[in-house]
């Protein structure tokens, strides 16, 4: 609501100007974090949709036009399950099996958070993912990675940390990503930790 008042009644065709207004005029915009930027993004997407409809062009044309005939997709957040097989994963075998399941649907890349649940599918507290992580935590993550590699071969793996790790633990898990040739490491720290 605080941000929407900055664009209501304005010309929706002036998308860049309105984005700058939301970012700079709002008390919350600059350095506002993921909630504020999600709100700005939602409004910006709506404005681009309006602009595309007025000009009778798809939004991708507004953003520079078509570049690729197809875009690669990955199966995301597999620690929660896949398709009708929904629920947290705990064991290394469960991580590997759910990745195989996604690959059977045609995916050749997967994204998982290895830090959310322990082997018994219980939530891992954030504090246990920060600093010098325990040997057990580190081994659990590596066991899951090894199981996926053994079951799925050269599937591209993205490690998603949801900002739950800090610099120290993020680097440690990043070393595992290097060791097992990961495709990417996503959000190893929160946006508020620029180091």
Per-region residue spans from a language model:
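Short, well-ordered coil loops that connect the C-terminus of an alpha-helix to the N-terminus
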Residues: 9, 57, 65, 153-154, ...
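Short, well-structured alpha-helical patches and their helix-loop capping segments
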Residues: 35, 39-40, 65, 87-94
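N-terminal amphipathic alpha-helix/helix-capping segment at the start of soluble metabolic enzymes
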Residues: 22, 53, 57-71
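Metal-dependent enolase-superfamily TIM-barrel catalytic cores that perform enediolate-based chemistry
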Residues: 70, 75-194
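Short alpha-helical segments and helix-capping/turn motifs at coil-helix boundaries
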Residues: 46, 58-59, 93-98
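Active-site phosphate/pyrophosphate- and oxyanion-stabilizing loops and adjacent acidic/basic residues
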Residues: 49, 61, 146
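Beta-hairpin (beta-strand-turn-beta-strand) motif
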Residues: 48, 65, 76-78
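Metal- or metallocofactor-binding catalytic centers and their adjacent structured scaffolds
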Residues: 1-55
């Amino acid at each position: 609501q605080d941000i929407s008042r900055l664009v209501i009644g304005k010309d929706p065709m002036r998308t860049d100007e309105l984005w700058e207004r939301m970012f700079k005029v709002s008390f919350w915009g600059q350095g506002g974090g993921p909630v504020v930027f999600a709100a700005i993004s939602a409004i910006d997407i709506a404005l681009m949709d309006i602009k595309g409809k007025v000009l009778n062009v798809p939004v991708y044309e507004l953003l520079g036009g078509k570049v690729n005939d197809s875009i690669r997709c990955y199966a995301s957040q597999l620690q929660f399950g896949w398709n009708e097989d929904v629920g947290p994963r705990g064991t290394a075998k469960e991580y590997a099996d759910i990745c195989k399941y996604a690959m059977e649907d045609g995916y050749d890349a997967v994204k998982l958070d290895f830090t959310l649940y322990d082997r018994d599918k219980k939530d891992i507290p954030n504090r246990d993912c920060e600093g010098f992580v325990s040997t057990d935590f580190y081994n659990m993550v590596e066991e899951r990675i090894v199981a996926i590699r053994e079951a799925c071969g050269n599937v591209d793996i993205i490690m998603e940390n949801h900002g739950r790790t800090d610099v120290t633990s993020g680097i440690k898990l990043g070393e595992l990503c290097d060791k097992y040739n990961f495709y990417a490491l996503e959000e190893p720290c929160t946006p508020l930790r620029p180091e």
